[in-house]
Amino acid sequence: MLPSLQSLTKKVLAGQCVPTNQHYLLKCYDLWWHDGPITFDHNLKLIKSAGIKEGLDLNTALVKAVRENNYNLIKLFAEWGANINYGLVSVNTEHTWDLCRELGAKETLNEEEILQIFIDLKFHKTSSNIILCHEVFSNNPILQKVNNIKMRIEIFWELRELIEKTDLLNNEFSLSTLLLKYWYAIAIRYNLKEAIQYFYQKYTHLNTWRLTCALCFNNVFDLHEAYEKDKIHMDIEEMMRIACIKDHNLSTMYYCYVLGGNINQAMLTSIQYYNIENMFFCMDLGADAFEEGTIALGEGYKLIKNILSLKIYSPATTPLPKSTDPEIIDHALKNYVSKNMMIFLTYDLR
């Protein structure tokens, strides 16, 4: 839709750095949202306010305004270029529905359009965005129009390590439960602290899921927060197994090792999942499950069997700090290079 002169003026004003003593002007122009001034980043097309400091893209901001039945902002965001059809996924009153139609929205969205809006809205990995996505799509009847398998494919792709190597997200869960676990997992994967706390406070029955995601996605900071502060515990060997299912998970593996996890079992798990960097890291920490690892592989896996057959490995001579402090672990492992991996890579196999 063509913007009015007034909306263009507001757009320019929202892009300015307005002094605090002139915020009353922004209130007069309805550039006020969640107890703070609305600002608009023209380059990134991000809407920000006191309640959404990380920002929402224009279409997502429209979805939020529609959900809140904020008619002034719905009109404003539509005039600024937001796709009014996006509002149809969060519309919840007849009056707002009528307004969206007046602004050019379609009568209904088809399956492909709904799925594309879902994909677009979940793209930005910020706390504000993930919380909004959860609120919009939780038990949303519009998702009934989308093929269940297509929705699951979109969810499973980002959580494929958990899907492939655990049974935690099998088909017995409803789509609503699956989506809830998905948003929680994304918050942990990208260490979105505000979103993590939102889900933790609201869904205490998913505490084990939080710990599992922190282990799998190598988020040693939230792992420590959950384990030490919030006292979310599980068997240490199961924790180590989950940490080993994804390669390069050195931080959460080491955390479990310091807690007393069996490093030989961790080496075996890493071998079974063909996670070579994890395997070498276990060797650095003193693991020596070479024969057991070769047997566990069975047929095939020539490369890893060749690695295990060599008698050239030994524990790292420079010990890592025995601490569960996530800052210390992160600092120690940020640029970590496995001693035993380097030995193998420089070994003359001829």
Curated annotation (Swiss-Prot):
Query: Which protein family is named in the record?
Result: Belongs to the asfivirus MGF 360 family.
| Organism expressing this protein natively | African swine fever virus (isolate Tick/South Africa/Pretoriuskop Pr4/1996)
> What does this protein's UniProt record list under function?
Plays a role in virus cell tropism, and may be required for efficient virus replication in macrophages.
Record lineage: Viruses, Varidnaviria, Bamfordvirae, Nucleocytoviricota, Pokkesviricetes
Q: Outline the ANK repeats, range by range.
A: 57-89
Name the GO terms of the biological process aspect: taxis
Name the UniProt record assigns to this protein: Protein MGF 360-12L
Q: Does the keyword Nuclease apply?
A: no
Q: Give the UniProt keywords, A-Z.
A: ANK repeat
